[in-house]
């Protein structure tokens, strides 16, 4: 096999050959390495010697813009700062500057509805594990077309199973790092098993989290339970759902909302199981390890919480960061 020796002058023709159907979802990317925004997917690159690439040494957040408003951005930036402190990574910009970069990138993308992925890397500098060989951290912001769960899953529910992949230790569980190998294996496990999601278990048999999802249980007594955050990521969507669920307690649709250990058997016997995530907001799980949950159909609390979340996302101006000047 003869290898092509490619040079800079070849890039224009390579860009035409490069495009694939999925690239249509990549709308814009800001790179602090390039110092600007690109909209051609061929240019959406990260240096191979960036420690985020070869060591997973970076952190990230994913959030969405709905009708020209970024939802709950401050919660994501707060968690980004927590992750940065935990891995001793200096953010190359303050929250206000990061917000301006995100807003500017969305504007250039030309869309009002999108999913944004914000990465902060250790930066380029070499191929060892030594973080000090990187002169400075870098920021990459990718704006993509919005994605969500199929309407069928919202209407009929999803199937989940317990995972065989070891749960993360507490220190790493609450760092949203770019080292997501356990999460990748959990998703592979779900696809291979023919279910939508798998749920991690700790050493004592208590529920953890999905590959990118938090889980909640509505008991037959009307208690909405969530696993403790000690071994799982403090999800922004589930945190918001907890706040909103208090109105259901006041309306006597729920008895209370708690964080506690949840066994598999308790989950099997629950009346509803709920999944929470940035892309789909909330989904009902109607089958767990082959056990039908509750009536086998999405329940009342799912429908009520879904409505509350949708109203919060669309109408809660206190959690909106406007992208366009007219707003």
Regions found by a protein language model. Give the residues of each.
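Helix-start/capping segments and mature chain N-termini
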Residues: 1-93, 100-104, 126-327
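Short, acidic/charged, Gly/Pro-enriched secondary-structure junctions
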Residues: 96-127
């Amino acid at each position: 096999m003869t290898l092509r020796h490619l040079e800079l002058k070849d890039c224009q023709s390579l860009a035409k050959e490069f495009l694939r159907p999925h690239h249509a979802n990549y709308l814009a990317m800001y790179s602090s390495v390039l110092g600007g925004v690109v909209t051609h997917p061929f240019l959406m690159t990260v240096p191979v010697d960036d420690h985020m690439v070869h060591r997973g040494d970076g952190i990230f957040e994913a959030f969405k813009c709905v009708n020209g408003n970024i939802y709950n951005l401050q919660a994501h930036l707060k968690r980004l700062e927590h992750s940065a402190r935990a891995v001793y990574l200096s953010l190359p910009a303050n929250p206000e500057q990061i917000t301006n970069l995100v807003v500017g990138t969305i504007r250039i993308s030309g869309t009002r509805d999108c999913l944004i992925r914000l990465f902060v890397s250790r930066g380029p500098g070499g191929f060892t594990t030594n973080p000090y060989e990187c002169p400075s951290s870098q920021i990459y912001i990718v704006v993509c077309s919005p994605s969500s769960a199929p309407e069928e899953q919202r209407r009929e529910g999803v199937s989940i199973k317990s995972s065989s992949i070891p749960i993360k230790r507490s220190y790493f569980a609450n760092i949203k790092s770019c080292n997501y190998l356990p999460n990748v294996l959990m998703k592979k496990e779900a696809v291979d098993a023919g279910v939508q999601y798998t749920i991690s278990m700790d050493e004592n048999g208590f529920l953890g989290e999905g590959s990118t999802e938090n889980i909640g249980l509505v008991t037959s007594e009307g208690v909405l339970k969530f696993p403790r955050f000690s071994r799982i990521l403090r999800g922004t969507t589930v945190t918001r759902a907890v706040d909103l669920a208090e109105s259901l307690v006041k309306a006597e649709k729920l008895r209370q909302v708690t964080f506690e250990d949840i066994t598999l058997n308790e989950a099997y016997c629950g009346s509803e199981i709920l999944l929470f995530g940035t892309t789909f907001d909330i989904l009902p799980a109607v089958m767990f390890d082959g056990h039908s949950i509750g009536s086998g159909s999405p329940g009342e609390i799912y429908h009520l919480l879904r409505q509350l979340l949708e109203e919060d996302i669309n109408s809660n101006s206190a959690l909106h960061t406007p992208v366009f000047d007219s707003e």
